[in-house]
Amino acid sequence: TFDPQGFSLKIFKDRYAFTPEETWQEACQRVAHQIASAESPIKQKTYQDKFYEILSSNYFVPGGRIWYNSGRPNPQLLNCFVLDPKKDSKEGWGDSARAMIITSMTGGGCGDDFSDVRPRGATIAGQRGAAPGAVELMRLIDACAQPVRNGGQRRVALMFSLDLSHPDIEEFLSAKLVKGELTHANISVRSRHTKAFIKAVKEDGEIELHWKGQYKRSIKARILWDTIVKNAYNSAEPGFLNWELVEHESNIHYIEELVTTNPCGEIPLEPFGNCCLGHIVLSRFVVDGEIDYAALGDTIRLGVRFLDNVLSVNHFPLPQMKTKADNLRRIGLGTTALADTLALLGYRYGSEEGNKFIDKLGRFISKAAYEASVLLAVEKGPFPLCHSMKHVESGFMKRMPAKTKSLVMEHGIRNCMLLTQAPTGTVSILSENCSSGIEPMFAPAYERRYWEGDERKMELVFHPLFAKFMSEGKSVDHFVGSQELTVRDHLEVQRIIQRHVDNAVSKTINMPHDYPVEDMEKLWLEYLPYLKGTTFYRESTRGFINANGEVEEPPLKAISLDEAKRRFKESHKTGTEGVMECPSGVCSL
């Protein structure tokens, strides 16, 4: 059984409850009823009960829009979409702004690629003026997001990408260095020829910038790379999208190209594609120090069916989005609480033993999810554009077990792609304050600073699992916080997980503030070919902006393991155990 308490309950009431009086069990019934309505009448009650069981027990937690909008009129249940990249015209500019506004007003984040836009200074047929360029259109879209943010319940979330070969790439790389520019968007460089780019960087070669074969010029690859590294080191942006790997791994390589990712980068998408997200709470499957793989497999199968049903009952912001979802039926089944799971099993996050377990777990989840989708194809039909023989030719499918590939070739598959790893920040707080996604725990303990009226206060907070272990007298020596891991530890975990995920992985590579930029650059270049997307964050490079727009110290300060153990024992002696809830809501995790 599960019932949110403390800060988890606050998140549920503030973010997801239908009314202030709605209970957790009532919300689970509401969601289960909505999603089971996609089933045939004879099966609806059966699957409503099954969905309720995995929701109410906190085995499976769907994306936030599913929690919030299920049961409402014309529910929009999907977290994110990607917009049309074709925008090199007056109509294209207008359509881009309109699509972003309409989608954002339903609560959907938007990914948008601008590589189709002619570069700054290019000629425009029939006009005397020169083209304003891709970055200028980004500024327009970002400006349109401000009133949507002010008028809605959620902050607008955008991803802007530009191809590495676009003539405006240098302007793009520096666009967010100006205060107040592109404040609603994450930005990422998209590279379709990553291996060639890496080779050019190492050999001090050049790459050609061009737009549709025009406006060609050459630039040293090292100049672009150094700018990417420097800006990411100092401001956590841009990210780098290895589109060569994305396309190589894509199961729909025979249908259409992918264009960019959703705002957090966990799903590379085709034009008008969507993120249909749900997460398995891994720590709930640890029983007597082992994973209950039978129960996990059952939940994976129900999770795939649940998310496939979401596509059937969803009300899409734009008709093109519905058409794309109907034709491809892409879903994003992921996990959360990986770090907690490792701790429960006695593994240190980033250790060799822990990584072997992650690899084994990834193989199990991917196989179970794909075979569940094949069973759905037998029952409900494969996705309409499925060509089973071509489907198994993708880079990802070639790594699947022979039996799984044979099943796909024989029956087709219900969902074109199935797996992802999303950040899961808020829904992880909802799920017992568990560790978020595949990230390490922030710290075994930390100080949280917050405002109470005009008074700045601080409280000591222990990670719930750390507190449980300490209270029970168990060893916590394998607990490790994000800041105590090496950069290679972070990258290696992401590399292992990416091999078992057909969509992509959203992970932040954390670095200490004094970490050498030269070391970051070498490791990034080493791991770049194996990761679809990378985002680095150096501690305190962005600061923390409070409600008055002022910069102050971040609200969370990590405490070392030894210090956490000492302060936990002291708090027990004095009867002042650290609070595990956030009274202010400032927590950004």
Residue ranges of model-derived segments:
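Alpha-helix capping and helix-loop boundary segments enriched in small/acidic/polar residues
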Residues: 19-22, 42, 66-73, 84-91, ...
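Gly/Pro-rich turn-and-neighbor structural signature
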Residues: 35-83, 91, 208-217, 221-231, ...
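Acidic/polar, glycine-rich intrinsically disordered N-terminal extensions of enzymes
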Residues: 1-77, 84, 225-227, 515, ...
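Flexible, glycine/charged-enriched surface loops at secondary-structure junctions
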Residues: 42-47, 109-112, 152-159, 242, ...
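Function-dense linear segments that define catalytic or interfacial modules
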Residues: 32-39, 52-126, 134-137, 148-151, ...
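Internal maturation/activation junctions in enzymes
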Residues: 97, 213, 299-322, 347-424, ...
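Conserved catalytic alpha/beta cores of large enzymes that bind or transform nucleotide phosphates
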Residues: 131-141, 146-226, 230-231, 238, ...
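Catalytic alpha/beta core of large soluble enzyme barrels
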Residues: 3-6, 265-268, 307-312, 393-398, ...
